[in-house]
Amino acid sequence: YGVTTGGALVLVALLLIFFYLLYVVKPIFNGASMESTASFTLPIKGKTAWLGVEEQNEIGYRFSDLGKVKFFAVQPDGKIKTGQVIGEAQVNGEITAVAPPAPGQKLIAYGFADGKAQVVQPYFKISYPNDVRVIEPSLQYPFGETPVVIDPQGKALTRMVFEATKDKMATAAVTED
């Protein structure tokens, strides 16, 4: 009886392994699905030029075509609700063109009425006061806070695109003339 019982238990173990593998592999063949977990509106004027979240998926940001930047909570915290604005910034100057970032890039460029352009990126400073992680959103200017001259004649930029690396930037722009 011992050999028969042992053989039966081996078959049961093989069946259990088979069903476990089927349970693990079956979701691969299901169709993709997506569902909304939260929805909120932000009180920002202008069209959205760029919308994104920081790497921890806790703070989102929205750059408008008018140069207004709002940082908002994506996940609720003890004191902060989802969608609550937690920081604001403004790109200074009379904005006439916006170049949204290329895929995988974290930079946006604004063109101004005086033929200059400025590259901006969201920056998140992390600190640990009293052993609590705090993320402070702000703007960073990787090519300096002084706008770069694109059109030496000072004509307003109406359309522009750009590509940037760590220390170089290439820009193509159309002026109003």
Where does each model-flagged region fall?
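WD40-repeat beta-propeller superdomains and closely related acidic/aromatic-rich repeat-like regions
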Residues: Y1-A13, I17-D177
